[in-house]
């Protein structure tokens, strides 16, 4: 009888371990599936009757490094809370970025306030030639080969939103061909056509 009780207790412990493993594999895996980049953290003050109240704002870029990216802005009394709010806000504004392999389909320019960002496709192995705010957006979006130039404002908030505007302005070659009434062969880059001819997915 005592031996049976010990065996029963052992199986209960294994069941508890299995439950812990299952419970720990959900939200943690979902969180790790995204790439997060904190672009800017600022301290702001609100003047009230009793003095000034300080809080923090965080500009965060979140993406899956596979064509999906979003930007969020969080505000809280503590920096970690502001970042967490920014991450949740970014996830609400996810959008898809058209890509050809590891680069973008065509040159594009985005503008936001006084910020202007120019993006150009690059050959494999070039890497992300960009400054901090632009690089954060491109890496989270999964664009690994691209040339960029930031014109105008150096404010990271304007630069990030200008980069997002540029990525939103991208179109796949099929969309461009349909809009112009041309065959895909006249619009698509040669590398894309070669890849499709070889049976690779683009």
From Swiss-Prot:
Keywords: Ribonucleoprotein, Ribosomal protein, RNA-binding, rRNA-binding. Residues 14-23 have a biased composition (Basic and acidic residues). GO terms for molecular function: rRNA binding; structural constituent of ribosome. It comes from the Bacteria. GO terms for biological process: translation. The keyword DNA-binding does not apply. Transmembrane segments: none annotated. The keyword rRNA-binding applies. Gene3D superfamilies: 3.30.160.20, 3.30.230.10. Pfam families: Ribosomal_S5, Ribosomal_S5_C. InterPro entries: Ribosomal_Su5_D2-typ_SF, Ribosomal_uS5, Ribosomal_uS5_bac-type, Ribosomal_uS5_C, Ribosomal_uS5_N, Ribosomal_uS5_N_CS, Ribsml_uS5_D2-typ_fold_subgr. Part of the 30S ribosomal subunit. Contacts proteins S4 and S8. With S4 and S12 plays an important role in translational accuracy. The N-terminal domain interacts with the head of the 30S subunit; the C-terminal domain interacts with the body and contacts protein S4. The interaction surface between S4 and S5 is involved in control of translational fidelity. Belongs to the universal ribosomal protein uS5 family. This is Small ribosomal subunit protein uS5. It comes from Frankia casuarinae (strain DSM 45818 / CECT 9043 / HFP020203 / CcI3).
């Amino acid at each position: 009888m005592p031996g049976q009780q010990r065996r029963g207790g052992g199986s209960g412990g294994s069941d508890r371990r299995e439950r812990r493993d299952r419970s720990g594999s959900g939200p943690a895996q979902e969180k790790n599936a995204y790439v997060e980049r904190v672009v800017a953290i600022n301290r702001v003050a609100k003047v009230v009757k009793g003095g000034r109240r300080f809080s923090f704002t965080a500009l965060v870029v979140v993406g899956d490094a596979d064509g999906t990216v979003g930007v969020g802005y969080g505000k809280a009394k503590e920096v970690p809370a502001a970042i967490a709010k920014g991450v949740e806000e970014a996830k609400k504004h996810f959008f898809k970025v058209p890509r050809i392999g590891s680069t973008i389909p065509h040159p594009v320019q985005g503008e936001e306030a006084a910020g202007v960002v120019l993006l150009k496709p690059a050959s494999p192995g070039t890497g992300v030639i960009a400054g901090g705010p632009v690089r954060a957006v491109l890496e989270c979006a999964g664009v690994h080969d691209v040339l960029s130039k930031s014109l105008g404002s150096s404010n990271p908030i304007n630069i990030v939103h200008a980069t997002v505007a540029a990525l939103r302005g991208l179109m796949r070659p099929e969309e461009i061909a349909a809009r112009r009434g041309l065959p895909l062969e006249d619009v698509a880059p040669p590398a894309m056509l070669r890849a499709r001819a070889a049976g690779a997915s683009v």
